[in-house]
Amino acid sequence: MTTKQPNIGNMQAGYAKQRKIANIAVYIILSIMVVIWIFPIVWLVFQSFNGEKGVALATFFPKTWTFDNYIKLFRQEGLSDPMDPTSPMIVLPVDRMPFPYGRWITNTFIVAVFSCLISTLIILMVSYALSRLRFKSRKMLMNFGLILGMFPGFMSMAAIYNIMEIIGLGKQLFSLVIVYSSGAGLGYQIAKGFFDTIPRSLDEAAKIDGATRNQIFWIIILPLSKPIIVYTALTTFLGPWADYVFVSYFMKGDDQKYTVAMGLYEMLKPETMHEWFTVFCAGAVLIAVPITILFTIMQRFYVAGVTGGAVKG
């Protein structure tokens, strides 16, 4: 009596075929998802070059191509309600826009840069302290910060606004910087995890040589932390750059203090949408360019073995 042995070659071939079919199915699903995700972006870019006005455009590709939508963005600096009969808009040339887009760009850049610098510094210092220092109630403090970070910031928006009004910072760009930076320390988790990977022996060796904790952080640890610095800087820059919620509450009614997100939303009001929709598309494309360039330049720092071989055996 003989026992039939399984054909290993056939089994491997069958497994390879199944894996190939599964991979093809996955690629098809991913391709469909990419198309769904990228279609609105491509459409927005095309409409930013559209020479026609209106929202309900009949074709995906513009019938007439023009750069005028981008030029119009910077042809007017500040204006009152375009539906007001006394508005200066009625005396403007027809190719000028009733929205101070240039001012919005400047406001957004100022708020985003200062918020980024302050928030990055706070996050790095808090994360390093929690990574290296051992003190009473340390874990409780970390858990408390984690729980607080789960609550969305807009829950305290009204209270923060009232406080800013009381201290005389209502409708000021500086108040936005304070709001975006004040809760930065709660985002310590990722940076702390990175600092945990840097060997403590570096700190100990520096202490033996007479370095203070402050010198260790600035001179030794930070130069080894480019990836987390870049990550933190990008995330803290992107938040204020694209935020709408806080700006809409803090700066409502003063279009000279708007950031781009708030300003672009104003273009989509029923009374202005038809006239300025393609210009809105141009503004949306333009505001995405700095972030795209910034990420493209700095993404190489994301993958770096900065701690590999830092401690010699």
What are these regions (language model features)?
Residues 4-9, 14, 18, 22-313:
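A structural signal for multi-pass alpha-helical bundles of membrane permease subunits
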